[in-house]
Curated annotation (Swiss-Prot):
Chaperone involved in the maturation of iron-sulfur cluster-containing proteins. Has a low intrinsic ATPase activity which is markedly stimulated by HscB. InterPro entries: ATPase_NBD, Heat_shock_70_CS, HscA_NBD, HSP70_C_sf, HSP70_peptide-bd_sf, Hsp_70_fam, ISC_FeS_clus_asmbl_HscA. Disulfide bonds: none annotated. GO terms for molecular function: ATP binding; ATP hydrolysis activity; ATP-dependent protein folding chaperone; unfolded protein binding. CDD domains: ASKHA_NBD_HSP70_HscA. This is Chaperone protein HscA homolog. Belongs to the heat shock protein 70 family. NCBIfam families: HscA, PRK05183.1.
Amino acid sequence: MALLQIAEPGLSPQPHQRRLAVGIDLGTTNSLVAAVRSGLSEPLADAEGQVILPSAVRYHADRVEVGQSAKIAASQDPFNTVLSVKRLMGRGLTDVKQLGEQLPYRFVGGESHMPFIDTVQGPKSPVEVSADILKVLRQRAEASLGGELVGAVITVPAYFDDAQRQATKDAARLAGLNVLRLLNEPTAAAVAYGLDQKAEGVVAIYDLGGGTFDISILRLTGGVFEVLATGGDTALGGDDFDHAIASWIVTDAGLSADIDPSAQRSLLQAACSAKEALTDAESVEVVYGEWRGTLTREALNALIEPMVARSLKACRRAVRDTGIELEEVEAVVMVGGSTRVPRVREAVAELFGRQPLTEIDPDQVVAIGAAIQADTLAGNKRDGGELLLLDVIPLSLGLETMGGLMEKVIPRNTTIPVARGQEFTTYKDGQTAMKIHVLQGERELISDCRSLARFELRGIPPMVAGAAKIRVTFQVDADGLLSVSAREMGSGIESSIQVKPSYGLTDDEVTRMLKDSFEYAGDDKVARVLREHQVDAERLLEAVQGALDADGERLLDEEERLVINLQMDELRELMQGTDGYAIEQQTKRLSQVTDAFAARRLDSTVKAALAGRNLNEIEE
């Protein structure tokens, strides 16, 4: 609930009377904090006048060093200096070991638990490292604004899953920050440009940072920012450009690819410096140790072209998700320091057929937008009216159904916050419990989706199969965090779970889930139809077998039992194969040959129920 602001008649509250809230861009390479002052959103500088804080943390035995000095010391003290910690947020040790070549740290911890980086100050989790960055930003903001913060809006990549978002909130709390909201980075950029340009129409947000790439397609109408679709690649960014240049240096200099962490840091610093110099120059001299070489912009373009092409492919996919054409995109906003690379801007302009917008510093635009939203959430009235943000979930959410199928409850690109419910039922007679398996992904089979959580609903009243009604409700809050509940409608029993996975998706998994959903759409549909026919067949076989065991000897002669058993054997054999149509047809044949048996059972049941009762009793 926003506090009511009171001022003398005819006077507006002064800036220091506003509730102090900030927007924070917690980036892979750099981080920033911004705030609204005198009606304008602007980044806040440190005592030296620097706005950008490198996301680097160096641990000493008795103190913590954050920022530029830590970044510079990384090559001399690689084991105690953590860079790009954002890549580790919400992930397990097994996942981060896959990035071992790029992360020169000593990890400790169980294989399925949060990774800890072994430092001279002891083990440090990614949450703790991020918290140390956030503490510096909080202290900077409070010093600049002259008071204690009521909260912060912190931005995250659109592709961050539940575990990564929760880890970000945990880091903020550890840093002494009240999280007003987590905001997708592309949406924050849209807020910044929407405020300055009052634009309406369809806009693309191309966000290429140090470690992640996000593309979002938004519709801006009358102050409402609606995210139509999102996409991207969590394993693509300026860091990857640096690694490509570093590989070129190693090859051109004839060096061994097996180098120690300290040398690797120096190599990457040389690569990054060359990349930045080529933003304005056509060629640059690269110096690494005793080796000197020349890298041209043309050569750089060739090195990074595969990565640029990957980003454009994600752009096309996101536009296709919206159902619009590329020509309908009226503006393209560039976000992230890596969009300064000339080839990136050229490629984006070629794809969308228009020059991208770069009026706001691409390193600052996300923090500026987050600050605008933080100011609004803190209860400070904005000139020009209110602002409504409609984020979306990046991947579909659903449940496992019989046959190992994924039943989507909330499709991807659904606006959040959202709550959706769907009714399910029991599979077997007398079933008193149901296992709820929550999944995330775009494929039809659960083996191709990501498992988020499992829980059970117990105490379901015994009924015949299909009679119970269990309503499962998915709720995603404004931060993208998911809770799931299941309720048996007759008895009212309920069970629920808040989905907090111990670690998040790997980079490869995030990319694969969307890519494969398109690439294997046809195969998935065939596989789903096959499994549905197999489930129907299995259900019928169980029902027929149960009927035979109960009444077969009494109601069928030997020849009738033989015919039914032959049809059942035929169906069981077909179920081992992959011909869904054949299974469907044989299921129908078995159903037909058992129709007479079912009718006799019904007749027998009715007669048994009426035995010994007269007409008057029946009518009553």
